[in-house]
Amino acid sequence: MIDQELAQSLKAWPFKEALQIIKKNGGLQNFKIPSKGYVLLETGYGPSGLPHIGTFGEVVRTSMVKNAFSSIIDCPTKLITFSDDMDGLRKVPENVPNKEMLEKFIGKPLTSIPDPFGKFESFGHHNNAKLRSFLDKFNFDYEFVSSTEKYQNGDFNETILNIFENYSKILDIILPTLRLSLIHI
């Protein structure tokens, strides 16, 4: 661990990003630890294919910011690696067996598709396990979260209902930010 005063003066991008988080939460002098007791950082993973260098890079970069943050200010942090495993399969990856079988599941949630490798409950579960194994080999400090589990547990229900109830207000905010070519409502 480096000295806090030194960490606050470093110009490397992870430290600049960490300082932005601190600034948005009261600054160095008035920083308040969030009510949950930690600052949360998150990475996302779309398990429609096997983990790759881009997946690794996202976790590395976020971990660098997390470590810089912890060097600058005394506040617990948590890194969540969130798997969007309810996403639909858009195309069959080139580097998997049983491609013909997977073709039948285009558009289906990744955790509802049989594992073409025949090792896990689903293709999504297989790729999630690969990611966790990959991250564990490099000793990343993270918590893995599956969107399938979150949906099945009802963890998103309140937010989804809130979105439905405020749909028009949300559109009023979002639509002006979209290019006209993207609007198909």
Identify the function of each model-found stretch.
Residues 101-120, 134, 138:
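A glycine-rich helix N-cap at a beta->alpha junction
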Residues 122-134:
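Two-metal-ion acidic nuclease core segments, chiefly of the RNase H-like superfamily
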Residues 53-60:
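Di-metal (Zn2+ and/or Mg2+/Mn2+) metal-binding site signature of metallo-dependent hydrolases
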Residues 49-51, 86-90, 152-155:
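Short catalytic/ligand-binding loop motif for oxyanion handling, primarily in non-cytosolic enzymes
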Residues 80-87, 147-148:
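Short, solvent-exposed turn/loop segments enriched in Gly/Ser/Thr/Pro and often Arg
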Residues 86-103, 159-161:
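Charged, often glycine-rich, active-site loop that binds/positions anionic groups
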Residues 1-53, 67, 71-81, 97-103, ...:
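Non-catalytic terminal extensions that flank enzyme cores
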Residues 136, 140-183:
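Active-site cores that bind ATP or allylic diphosphates and position pyrophosphate for catalysis
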